Design a protein with these regions (language model features):
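Short glycine-aspartate micro-motif
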Residues: 76, 86-90, 143-147, 212-216, ...
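Short, acidic, Ser/Thr-enriched surface-loop or helix-capping motifs
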Residues: 102, 156, 226
């Protein structure tokens, strides 16, 4: 009997989290639509919606054009302007990018804190605290939590970066323990490409794609696999997949890693070496390649290498869709089409099912990089509602 009570409580909390996810990821939604999509009874919908209204998490509004709605006008449910907000920080080697956003990842405040080339573990942690303080000082709404997205292998249970390369002289960093000393809200840490994949899942192509591979081209190369609308929690370090055992030595200790050939810095270095033109970011490199055949050839060869790396993932997981994000979002459509053709010509797993892999660009574009930090907290809310007191119940 005791176990039954526990299970019932968990079911109620799970139902609350599910309905909140449906409301957060929709511009607006009716109670009837909630019942259909959640497969919960109208009575359950009514009870939970009324609780959310009382807690000022959501509001009910009539549709803009009531004349077109026959019969009783269905009220639209939306996230309330008084609901809690989320703090997000994206940590890169050059800058800390901060944001305060709503439960629908609409930005309210954005602040950046540049990093020097001589940062240490102590200075990085202190600057994270400074930026968080600056962000929360500009909102009087309750803070749901802080999400930090970063490169590296992350232990999400402890909030520790367990291994990171090319990040000053830092190899490990305990973010949660340090920041939890200063803030009462929960702190969550996630690999930045995993975070971007969550953003794509909740607010991008994931709304229609249940299974996909998200590929992020940055200082390195990382990938995240979503199967059955669940993010697989392996490290996703695609860039450290060796494609040439006799190639140059990587910072990870291996040889011929993919990121030495197809990451953003490697592409920029190769263009400079072959054209004499120094470029500083992917956007300028793509523009230059449109008018320079040598630079275009660098892109072509690098993306051919990346295609083999993507194909290895597809052969393992048989996902039909590849979403290109971070700097790979900037790739010319012609290059993306060539990559898709190349992968289709060598892929085995999808061919077995008579299907062809599809490459598409992120629906949210470059915004997934920062908004993903917000989605780290949303994932906890949607999948583990008991982390947040307003979803727990004593019924």
């Amino acid at each position: 009997m005791e176990n039954s009570g526990i299970n019932l409580t968990k079911a109620k909390e799970a139902n609350r989290a599910l309905l909140l996810q449906l409301i957060c990821t929709s511009e607006s939604i009716t109670r009837t639509e909630l019942s259909v999509r959640s497969q919960l009874s109208p009575m359950t919908i009514t009870n939970i919606v009324n609780e959310f209204l009382a807690q000022k998490l959501i509001v009910e509004t009539p549709p803009e054009d009531t004349a077109r709605v026959p019969g009783r006008t269905p009220m639209l449910l939306q996230i309330s302007p008084d609901s809690p907000v989320i703090v997000g920080i994206r940590m890169t080697i050059h800058c800390l990018y901060g944001i305060v956003g709503t439960l629908t990842v609409h930005p309210i405040i954005q602040k950046d804190l540049p990093l020097s080339d001589k940062e240490t573990e102590e200075t990085i942690l202190d600057k994270l605290r400074q930026l968080t303080d600056a962000l929360i000082a500009e909102t009087d709404r309750p803070i749901l939590g802080l999400g930090i997205s970063t490169a590296g292998v992350i232990n999400q249970e402890t909030g520790v970066i367990e291994y990171i390369t090319n990040f000053f002289d830092i190899k490990t960093l305990d973010l949660r323990s340090y920041l939890s000393q200063f803030f009462s809200f929960p702190v969550f840490v996630c690999n930045e490409v995993h975070a971007a994949a969550l953003c794509e899942l909740y607010f991008g192509h994931g709304q229609t794609e249940n299974d996909f591979l998200y590929v992020g081209l940055t200082h390195g190369i990382a990938a995240s696999v979503v199967l059955g609308r669940r993010l697989l929690s392996f490290c996703g370090e695609m860039g450290h997949m060796s494609i040439d055992f006799h190639g140059p030595k990587c910072a990870c200790g291996s040889h011929g890693c993919l990121e030495l050939y197809a990451s953003t810095p490697s592409i920029l270095r190769r263009i400079t070496a072959e054209t004499g033109v120094e470029l500083h970011d992917m956007e300028s490199a793509v523009q230059f390649a449109q008018t320079n055949r040598t630079a275009y050839a660098v892109f072509y060869n690098a993306m051919r290498q990346l295609s083999y790396g993507i194909n290895n993932y597809l052969n393992l997981h048989s996902v039909p869709t590849v979403i290109l994000g971070h700097d790979s979002y900037l790739l010319p459509d012609e290059i993306v089409a060539q990559m898709e053709d190349k992968i289709a010509s060598i892929n085995i797993s999808m061919h077995h099912f008579g299907a062809r892999p599809k490459l598409i660009k992120s629906k949210l574009g470059m915004k997934t990089q920062l908004y993903g930090a917000l989605c780290i907290v949303l994932q906890q809310l949607f999948q583990n509602g008991t982390t947040f007191s307003f979803l727990s119940t004593n019924d």
